Amino acid sequence: MSILNVEKLTHGFGERAIFNDVSFRLLKGEHIGLVGANGEGKSTFMNIVTGQLQPDEGKIEWSKNVKVGYLDQHTVLEPGMTVRSVLQKAFDDLFVAEARINQLYMAMGDANEDEMNAMLEEVGELQERLDSHDFYILDAKIDEVARALGVAAFGMDSDVSELSGGQRTKVLLAKLLLEKPDILLLDEPTNYLDAEHIEWLKRYLQEYENAFILISHDIPFLNSVVNLIYHMDNQELNRYVGNYDQFQEVYAMKKSQLEAAYNRQQKEIADLKDFVNRNKARVATRNMAMSRQKKLDKMEVIELASEKPKPKFDFKTSRAPGRYIFQAEDLVIGYDRPLTGHINLEMERGQKIAIVGANGIGKTTLLKSLLGIIKPLNGKVTRGDYIDLGYFEQETPKGNRKTALEEIWDTFPSMTQPEVRAALARCGLTSKHIESQVQVLSGGEQAKVRFCKLMNEESNVLVLDEPTNHLDVDAKDELKRALQEYKGSILMVCHEPEFYEGLVTDIWDFSKFA
């Protein structure tokens, strides 16, 4: 049975086309991975099917009474609500059913026999619904999911308005899973999860009876939970049976076959054109030349999709710094309350360090405290001599109406326009990306704009906050290569062991500071 039908979907931003005449059908119980390079339109597709974005053309049709759950990381949580009260809202419909049962029992005292029978029948249906959803052990279900995703660690009575962005996303994910909708729409759900929580979510999705569509650049995770791949590429959406690795094999084979057919056809076209040119003027061979020309005219020419630009990262190194990069003495970090005990640490020239640990416990706050962006609650940070810092923030500020071109040009006004364009192109951005407003670019494309800034300023220390969060596989591999070759020091927050292993010299486990 079809849950969702998408017909002839076409959409773009200005002159930049995202989809062209795309159709899609989701069946009950399908576990779909939605994949594609940065900027191909995966998140845009999610926004369209959930009604948050109106397509230029096409039809979106959900089946009746289907319950859709979407992990929207921009959902606003009301100040004053606790973590527990937000999670309880996953069962609002069940609490409504319970209230209706109580209302019916109160009305039975004044009911006649027919009314009583009707009320008892309705109560029976409602009670069956409550029982089938384990209504009377909801608190235990809430606690189980909260522990499994690390939400309980924030404190179930904590005010959600005081949580970090990553913590709020975890709460929203927990609420979504508790709702158990007919279709789950998940956009990079592992970005804010630690290894043990990713493992739990993996098992949950493997056993999930209903359908889901998953966007993720975490390939091992994707491989373990999906049975279908939909690939977004060159404004098309194509279906492949199997997991991501199986898709890669079939896709590579199809691409190779198409290239071979293209090369054969190009040779045939060249031979036909050569024959026509040599023989069209001679009376004896004119008819044969005309016949070859007709064949050329009727030929359906094979076209190869243009190769997507791949980033080529290269970070410039400045002068050598002093021995120490940072020294922290009795450092206590936080905002209204301390997030750590007294921290004493130092970073020396040449070190490449990954800061790891649970999400939302203060890793970004530590970076900002070391950089002087946030004032510590106690202690001091001493920065070494001759330090030239490059800082990569986790997200681009919202509402940036500048184009990517303007963003870089404003930072480096001495560069010419061709130089700015070339710099952005080296980061894997096309002309249409370069001329688009930063706010309409995908998360991965926005990250590439921020990397472009880092690449065009000399540094001897790079401070990177979750640099891989929105990058596709090719961009991650290229970034790792560039950071391995970087001659300076690196301090980064990262939750992907497969990225920082083989790159860093030291690992700081933040849980030892908390």
Residue ranges of predicted features:
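Post-kinase regulatory C-tail/linker adjacent to protein kinase catalytic domains
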Residues: 313-315
